[in-house]
Amino acid sequence: MQYAKISGTGSYLPANRVSNDDLAQKVDTSDEWITARTGIKFRHIAAENEKTSDLAAEAARRALADAKLNINDIDLIIVATATPDMQFPSTATIVQQKLGITNGCPAFDVQAVCAGFMYALTTANAYIKSGMAKNALVIGAETFSRIVDWNDRTTCVLFGDGAGAVVLSASDKPGIIHSKLKADGNYLKLLNVPGQIACGKVSGSPYISMDGPGVFKFAVKMLSKIADDVIEEAGYTAEQIDWIVPHQANRRIIESTAKHLGLSMDKVVLTVQDHGNTSAASIPLALDAGIRSGQIKRGQNLLLEGIGGGFAWGAVLLQY
C-alpha cells in the first residue's frame, strides 16, 4: 500500500522576538493579562524587508536538508498562507523560484487560515497516494503582523510571524493514516479581514476583526469533535495517540481538546508561549520543534488539528 510519510521537517522564525512587556509599552495591556488568557509570552515579527515567501523558503530549505533531498527531487509545492506576498502569482511559485526548482512541478497556495496546513497536508497526501507526486513540499507560512491593528490590544497581542515546512514522501511504511476537513461559512463574521481590493481600490478595514469569545466557543466544540471523528474513523483510540500537535492559538483551547480526549498535557506539543498564533505556520512550527527537541520520535502516532476563520477546520492522524 502506498503511504505519504514525513521524511523531513524545517522551520524559520524572524529574528525580532517581541515580549508581552514590549507590547505593554505600546498598548494598554500587561504580561499577566496576556499570559492568563492565552498562554502567550513571546512572538516573532518579520523585518520590513522579509516577505512570507522568504520565511517559507528558509523553512523549506531546512526541511529539504532534513529529508536529504535535492531541490529538483520535489515534484509538488503547496503553501498554506492567508498573507501571500501579492495578489498573484501564488506564494508557492515564488518559493519555487527562490529555491531554484526548475523541473516545472505544480505549485499552488491553499487558503484556510489557521487550518491551512491541515488542508495542504491532506491535498499533498492525495497527490502522493494517487501516484501524481513522490516528494511534496508542504509549507505553512504567515506574516500576520502585516494585517494586525497594532493599536487594538485585543488582537495585536495574539499573533506572530513564522514558517514551518514538511517534505511528504511516498513510502510503503505507514505515514498519514487518516484526515478529515470541515468548513462552515455561516460563521465568517466571527473572524475575518473585511478589507478587499476591487477596481484598484481597497475597501473596508485591512486588519483582523475577531469576536474572541465566539471564536473560543466554536473552536473548543469543533476541535473536540473532529479529533474524535478522525481517531474513530481510523480505528484507533485516544490512548494510542503519542502526541497532539495542535494549532497554537490559545493554551486554554489546547487544554480543552486534550482534556476531552482524556490525555495529559504532557502529551501535547506546546509552543504557543514562544510563537503566539502564527496561523497556518503554527502546526508545522510546533511539529518541527517537537521533533528537534527529541519529544517526537519515529514510529509514534501524532494527531494534528487546527481551526481557522471561515470557519475551516481539520485533523490529521499520522505515524511519524
UniProtKB/Swiss-Prot annotation:
Cellular location(s): Cytoplasm
Residues the record marks as active site: C114, H247, N277
EC number of this enzyme: 2.3.1.180
Alphabetical list of SUPFAM superfamilies matching this protein: Thiolase-like (SSF53901)
GO molecular function, one term: 3-oxoacyl-[acyl-carrier-protein] synthase activity
Catalysis performed (reactions): malonyl-[ACP] + acetyl-CoA + H(+) = 3-oxobutanoyl-[ACP] + CO2 + CoA
Gene3D superfamilies the UniProt entry points to: 3.40.47.10
GO terms of biological process kind: fatty acid biosynthetic process
Enzyme class (EC, first level): transferase
Entry keyword annotation includes Amino-acid biosynthesis: no
SUBUNIT field: Homodimer.
Database matches in NCBIfam families: fabH, PRK09352.1
Protein name: Beta-ketoacyl-[acyl-carrier-protein] synthase III
